[in-house]
Amino acid sequence: MQKIRKGDKVVVLTGKDKGRTGEVIQVMPKEDRALVRGVNVVKRHQRQTQNQEAGIITKEASIHLSNIAIADPKDGKPTRVGFKIDGDKKVRVAKRSGDVIDG
């Protein structure tokens, strides 16, 4: 079970976007990286194609999983993730507040 999943609210811990929050768009577990909306935005020169014109576009670049942390559901500060058995389901729990992260 992954600690960070698509749709999670995360906080950037290091780098040029330190302290910014965003939603995880995609997780790449083999590369240990994730795409976060509005974080690590880069400009790319796009070549013209049949359905897209040329120009400079901005898009999110991936960020290493060690540089982001889940935002605590209670106060929005970064927290570590633990696991707990709730009935017959395994759920993610914020170590900071003890709140369940999963729905």
From Swiss-Prot:
Gene3D superfamilies found in the cross-reference section: 2.30.30.30
Gene Ontology biological process: translation
Family to which the UniProt record says this protein belongs: Belongs to the universal ribosomal protein uL24 family.
Keywords: Ribonucleoprotein, Ribosomal protein, RNA-binding, rRNA-binding
Name under which the protein is recorded: Large ribosomal subunit protein uL24
Gene Ontology terms for molecular function: rRNA binding; structural constituent of ribosome
GO cellular component: ribonucleoprotein complex; ribosome
Annotated InterPro entries: KOW (IPR005824), Rib_uL2_dom2 (IPR014722), Ribosomal_uL24 (IPR003256), Ribosomal_uL24_CS (IPR005825), Ribosomal_uL24_KOW (IPR041988), Translation_prot_SH3-like_sf (IPR008991)
